[in-house]
Amino acid sequence: MSTGLLAKKVGMTQIFTPEGDCVPVTVLEAGPCTVVRRKTAEKDGYDAVVIGFGVVDEKHAHRLSKPEVGVFKKAGTPIFRHVKEIRVKDAKQLGDLKAGDVLTVDKVFKANQRIDVAGVTKGRGFTGVMKRWNMKGAARDSSTAHEHHRHVGAIGQRKTPGKVWKGKHLPGHYGVDNVTIQNLTVVGIEAEQNVLLVSGAVPGHADGLLFVNTAAKGQPRIKQKQEVRERAKPKV
């Protein structure tokens, strides 16, 4: 079964390996997620599964439209705050999943597996070029104007082309971007607490919503190397 889970970022900590190395890890509350709908190529044009995460009280159901509530009632599941559709190329990747099935962290992932984590970065507001684009800034001597050393400086050329090029790095809004961190490693799994320990940092603030999925680039490359080694072995 190839699918992912919606998760909530709890925070960061560190663990020690048997060799004594200190590894920074991010603690994620991954799932449990419930299958809300199963899409098929025959009926919908593609194979996918829709999962829900974070149960909402019935008293807040009026905030959803009737078609949205109808999807949950048809599946016989609670109303969820977050819903995610996961497409696959082959229906075999989803196995026999159907509406109402519960996906837990130990069913989807395993230790030392490579994963991709997608989320929204922290919002920094309106920032200057030094913070937003890591520019060097001007010389910091006493002859410059007030805070001139943090200004962007010249942004154009001469009479030709006589304009500012599109994409020029300028001050502006920084953060709140969709970012995917690829090829992180699952360090540990606590199935009873639905906890997933991931090596390194992931985007977003604490309590932020994340989507954890099998790595798009990690596993196939390893498999490819194994096939190359098998073909390179001398035939007896």
Swiss-Prot record:
Keywords from the UniProt entry: Ribonucleoprotein, Ribosomal protein, RNA-binding, rRNA-binding
Quaternary context: Part of the 50S ribosomal subunit. Forms a cluster with proteins L14 and L19.
Protein purpose: One of the primary rRNA binding proteins, it binds directly near the 3'-end of the 23S rRNA, where it nucleates assembly of the 50S subunit.
Family the entry assigns: Belongs to the universal ribosomal protein uL3 family.
One Pfam entry name: Ribosomal_L3
HAMAP family: Ribosomal_uL3_B (MF_01325_B)
A GO molecular-function descriptor: rRNA binding
Single biological process term from Gene Ontology: translation
Organism: Anaeromyxobacter sp. (strain K)
Protein name, entry field: Large ribosomal subunit protein uL3
Cellular-component GO terms for this entry: cytosolic large ribosomal subunit
